[in-house]
Amino acid sequence: MTIDKINEIFKENWKNKLTKYEIARIISARALQLSMGALPLIDTSNLKSDDVISIAEEELKRGVLPITIRRIYPNGQVELISVRKIENR
């Protein structure tokens, strides 16, 4: 298999999914924003916990985060993916 074929297989399988590393990065970045005083994008009154990580996880789960993931492939190609359009929240 060539590297281009491997890249195509990866893109097809992960086009609408986030890796565990991307999820961790998104949640940690949003939790940092919340801890620095950013307003939550969801109503936090009915959440079990009011810590910033729980709020960030719920925002990701509901798909309200205006964050874009930049994936760089081994061949140098760059793909931008909006978190709002991802299926596996």
From Swiss-Prot:
SMART domains cross-referenced by the UniProt entry: RNA_pol_Rpb6
Origin superkingdom: Archaea
PROSITE patterns: RNA_POL_K_14KD
Major subcellular site: cytoplasm
InterPro entries per record: DNA-dir_RNA_polK_14-18kDa_CS, Pol_omega/Rpo6/RPB6, RPB6/omega-like_sf, Rpo6/Rpb6
Any single Gene Ontology cellular-component annotation: cytoplasm
Keyword tRNA processing: no
E.C. designation(s): 2.7.7.6
Reactions mediated catalytically: RNA(n) + a ribonucleoside 5'-triphosphate = RNA(n+1) + diphosphate
Role, per record: DNA-dependent RNA polymerase (RNAP) catalyzes the transcription of DNA into RNA using the four ribonucleoside triphosphates as substrates. Reconstitution experiments show this subunit is required for basic activity.
HAMAP family, per the entry: RNApol_arch_Rpo6
Protein name: DNA-directed RNA polymerase subunit Rpo6
Gene that encodes the chain: rpo6
